[in-house]
């Protein structure tokens, strides 16, 4: 058995050599490890020695901002010289969900070829929010504005039922079309009044594109029903209306349920939505009776048996905590 003195001598001899080998190993391997880590190209690794760590955060933030500013919407399909243009007329007004509604609608319209979006704001001037959104979409658009006079609105939360929201804005769009295209224009096109809170199937736009005079189809979630629809006979002609609310209206149809040939709009220059003396639910009739008769209507969507548009409504956000304790920045655009 080795003596204690011999064990101590062995330890004193081996320990220095162990330390030397360890130091040598570290000095050889460390540069290799550093090289592998730098391959990740972390900007923090590339910073100069002694630099302020906050500068790394600022650098990262700048990179993120560049990515954001370079983002663009998917561009619409290439323009075709053979397809009729669909002129989509959308009245809009300032409210918390306006940008969300217009963004959702833009994402639908971006898939439709040969589309011109006529957005008309109920405002004394065009707002920066809507202008930026339209510019960023890449859609072919026209941005108009006209403010509904106060005497056309009731004081308080309710509005005069004789002056439905969007009437003056739709009329301005009709005037713009007549001032832009000559009365005898050969430009093929279709005009569709599409509110910004509805939901639209892409199939709907292809259905309406072949409109000769006025085409019609069902609309879901209107009149207290799952859907309202034109009544079509076996010969494919519209003979009435499947609706509960005042079915004897000349055209008992929702604003989202019809499209008009552009040439008809140009030729019938007297046709507008009436501002006064029109009962609730008769706004559509006030325009259509100046354009066609019941016999002229063209049923679409499989003889008005398919639902391709839904009168959805976005729930009004409850912002009861807004402005409390500085949680949100009022300058942030929503």
Residue locations for each model-derived region?
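C-terminal catalytic/acceptor-binding lobe
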Residues: 1-53, 64-70, 247, 255-334
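Acidic, Ser/Thr-rich intrinsically disordered and amphipathic helical segments
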Residues: 14-15, 62, 87, 100-104, ...
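A conserved hydrophobic helix/loop-capping motif in glycosyltransferases and polysaccharide synthases
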Residues: 81, 87-95, 120-122
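Short loop->beta transition adjacent to catalytic acidic/histidine clusters or analogous donor-positioning motifs
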Residues: 84-86, 109-118, 139-142
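Short acidic, S/G/P-rich loop/turn micro-motifs used as interaction or catalytic elements
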Residues: 93-97, 124-125, 197-200, 272
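Short, well-formed alpha-helical segments that are part of the catalytic scaffolds
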Residues: 95-113, 125-133
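Active-site-proximal specificity loops/subdomain of glycosyltransferases
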Residues: 122-189
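Conserved catalytic core of nucleotide-sugar-dependent glycosyltransferases
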Residues: 161, 179-184, 192-194, 198-282, ...
């Amino acid at each position: 058995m080795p003596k204690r003195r011999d064990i101590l001598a062995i330890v004193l001899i081996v320990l220095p050599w162990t330390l030397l080998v360890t130091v040598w190993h570290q000095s050889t391997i460390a540069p290799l490890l550093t090289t592998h880590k730098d391959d990740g190209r972390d900007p923090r690794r590339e910073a100069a020695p002694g630099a302020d760590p906050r500068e790394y955060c600022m650098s990262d933030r700048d990179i993120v901002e560049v990515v954001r500013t370079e983002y663009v919407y998917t561009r619409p399909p290439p323009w075709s010289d053979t397809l009729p243009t669909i002129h989509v007329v959308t009245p809009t007004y300032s409210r918390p969900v306006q940008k969300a509604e217009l963004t959702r609608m833009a994402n639908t319209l971006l898939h439709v070829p040969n589309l011109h979006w006529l957005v008309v704001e109920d405002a004394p001037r065009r707002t920066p929010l809507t202008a930026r959104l339209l510019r960023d979409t890449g859609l072919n658009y026209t941005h108009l504005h006209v403010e509904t006079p106060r005497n056309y609105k009731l004081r308080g939360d309710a509005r005069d039922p004789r002056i439905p929201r969007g009437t003056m804005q739709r009329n301005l769009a009709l005037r713009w079309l007549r001032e832009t295209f000559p009365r005898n224009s050969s430009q093929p096109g279709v005009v569709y009044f599409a509110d910004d809170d509805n939901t639209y199937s892409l199939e709907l736009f292809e259905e309406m594109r072949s409109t000769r005079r006025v085409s019609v189809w069902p609309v879901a979630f209107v009149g207290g029903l799952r859907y309202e629809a034109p009544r079509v006979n076996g010969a494919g002609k519209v003979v009435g209306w499947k609706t509960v609310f005042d079915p004897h209206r000349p055209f008992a149809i929702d604003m989202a349920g019809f499209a008009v040939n552009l040439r008809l709009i140009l030729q019938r220059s007297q046709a507008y939505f009436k501002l006064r003396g029109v009962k609730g639910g008769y706004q559509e009739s006030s325009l259509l009776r100046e354009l066609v008769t019941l016999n002229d209507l063209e049923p679409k969507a499989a003889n008005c048996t398919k639902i391709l548009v839904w009168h959805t409504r976005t729930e009004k956000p409850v912002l009861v905590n807004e402005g409390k304790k500085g949680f949100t920045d009022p300058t942030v655009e929503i």
